[in-house]
């Protein structure tokens, strides 16, 4: 009887895994849905910029000063420097608008991909219902592109990705999965630091939740990886602030 019980428990994981959608199929579906959203928005709406974004774009593109300029307002210097360089190299491309659109649609793709990877096939009807409602709520941000909402979307996606990383035992695998969260948080911090800081408490809740799920976290590589994630996240924020302060350290500013 004990043997039969053991065999039954041991075979649960393969059955569950068999019900999962493959990563390739999840990637194909998420990209396909995002493409359909882009097509729908482009055919029915004309993307707009918020008032602050118009000013930021005009500074970055050189409309105000005659040459692309990285010293603008609110956004940190690391990000504005990259965008201003792109305007210098290819002035006929709307880089700022393209960047905000890439943030919105890129984060949508990542969230859809993660949803499809973590749910089994028999729950897809419920997931599609959630996705439909999600898209309706997100639609205004696809139409009117704003830097504040884009920073919030980046932070939310970073935390969502961090929360849904599987609790693997291998530290290198965990770090590879966390790299994307670092990148998203880094861009959010440089796009609008205040919004990124508002999202940090949610990351802390996820951090504590992950630790509470692991009974042996005090002596495991899992704890070290989680602490490394927190430390690197703080380094991202401090480094972005330090570079921005140095860029505006001249008496002229």
Language-model region placement:
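Aromatic- and kink-enriched transmembrane "portal" helix at the membrane-lumen/periplasm boundary
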Residues: 129-155, 186, 190
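Start-transfer (signal-anchor) and selected internal transmembrane alpha helices
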Residues: 1-38, 220-231
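Transmembrane-embedded, aromatic-rich helix segments that form part
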Residues: 193-209
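Short hydrophobic alpha-helices at membrane interfaces in multi-pass membrane enzymes
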Residues: 123-130, 164-186
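Juxtamembrane membrane-water interface segments immediately following transmembrane helices
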Residues: 197, 218-253
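Extracytoplasmic catalytic/substrate-binding loops of multi-pass membrane glycan-assembly enzymes
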Residues: 41-60, 68-83, 90-91
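Transmembrane-helix motifs of polytopic, lipid-linked glycan transferases
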Residues: 102-121
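Membrane-interface alpha helices of multi-pass inner-membrane proteins
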Residues: 176-193, 204, 231-236
């Amino acid at each position: 009887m004990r043997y039969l019980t053991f065999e039954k428990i041991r075979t649960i994981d393969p059955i569950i895994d068999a019900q999962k959608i493959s990563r390739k199929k999840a990637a194909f579906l998420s990209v396909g849905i995002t493409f359909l959203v882009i097509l729908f928005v482009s055919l029915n709406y004309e993307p707009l910029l918020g008032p602050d974004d118009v000013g930021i774009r005009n500074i970055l593109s050189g409309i105000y000063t005659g040459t692309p300029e990285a010293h603008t307002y609110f956004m940190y210097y690391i990000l504005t420097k990259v965008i201003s360089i792109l305007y210098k190299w290819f002035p006929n491309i709307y880089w700022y608008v393209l960047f905000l659109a890439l943030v919105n649609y890129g984060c949508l793709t990542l969230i859809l991909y993660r949803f499809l990877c973590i749910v089994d096939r028999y729950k897809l009807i419920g997931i599609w219902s959630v996705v439909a409602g999600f898209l309706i709520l997100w639609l205004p941000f696809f139409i009117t592109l704003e830097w504040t909402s884009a920073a919030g979307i980046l932070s939310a996606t970073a935390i969502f990705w961090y929360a849904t990383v599987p609790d693997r035992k291998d530290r290198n695998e965990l770090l590879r999965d966390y790299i994307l969260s670092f990148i998203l948080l880094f861009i959010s911090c440089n796009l609008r630091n205040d919004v990124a800081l508002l999202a940090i408490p949610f990351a802390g809740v996820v951090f504590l939740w992950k630790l509470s799920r692991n009974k042996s976290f005090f002596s495991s590589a899992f704890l070290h990886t989680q602490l490394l994630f927190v430390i690197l996240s703080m380094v991202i924020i401090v480094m972005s602030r330090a570079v921005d302060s140095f860029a505006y350290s001249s008496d002229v500013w």
